[in-house]
Amino acid sequence: MIKTDARMRLDRRRFLVGAAAIAGSALWPWPATAQSNRMRLILLGTGGGPRPRKASSAPAQVILLNDTAYVVDCGDGVARQLVFAGVALSSLRHIFLTHHHSDHNADYGNVVLLAWAAGLRTRVDAWGPPPLKRMTKQFFDLNAYDIATRIADEGRVPLVPLVHAHELNKGGPVMQDENLKVTAALVHHPPVVPAFGYRFDARDRSIVISGDTAPSDDLIKLAQGADVLVHDALYVPGIDRLVAGIPNATSLKQSIMSHHTTAEDAGRVAQAAGVKTLVLSHLVPAEDPAVTEQMWIDAARVHFRGPVIVGKDLLEI
């Protein structure tokens, strides 16, 4: 049974999916120092769009391996969700932004600032499309008074030198450390260009995060043989009810339909990529009582023959 009380959400449901090594893991040689702890994935926020909701936070997820946190997207409230998930904010080492929509980057700066307030003393590398470097500088400029005051008054290490922003303009290898390696692919999310999906390969398993995208051949190539594909998903019959409640966005339906993926097509992508498990996330509509979990699953299973999981906040996979 899923516990909905916030204090009880630490008892996350766990879905253990395949741990085989995958095609694509030979992109780079494995570091000799890589350890053997299992790579974990926790969905921090699974609702699509920037409007705050009661039960589903904005898009974010964290990959954990050997006490290191790799955060993918930073929607509103990501720091609090990390705390709910039992992740030490001081373990943050890498941030990957798929694209620059506010439901994916609104708390990019905040998660670093709050991690620093919670004891972060080590380097954090951020990866994503331009203008990530300018955004990073502007966030620190905005919060310069608070940062300087805390350094002087509380004896904290300087924050700005800890954060290193790296801008991506094309797909390919992103980074590799002693735990895993990361590869990006361009995905189709107009008018936001570039937008990326990311693949994380460790010794025991592989995880792909689609970001926001219409069905993408490049994403299918990126996800070949992956253990887990987390893909954004629409349930088309619920879109009209969603947009009816947002009267100041007159072309919202057209926007949603043109550069996201239906649950059925997410299944098609997963099948074409040969992934082991499909996770539907960035759900649109989120929290519509007329759209049941089984409806999402049935739509994805039109084309995908493997396990389908409907994402929920704080679900560990």
Each model region followed by its residue ranges:
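N-terminal signal peptide c-region/cleavage motif recognized by signal peptidases
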Residues: 29-31
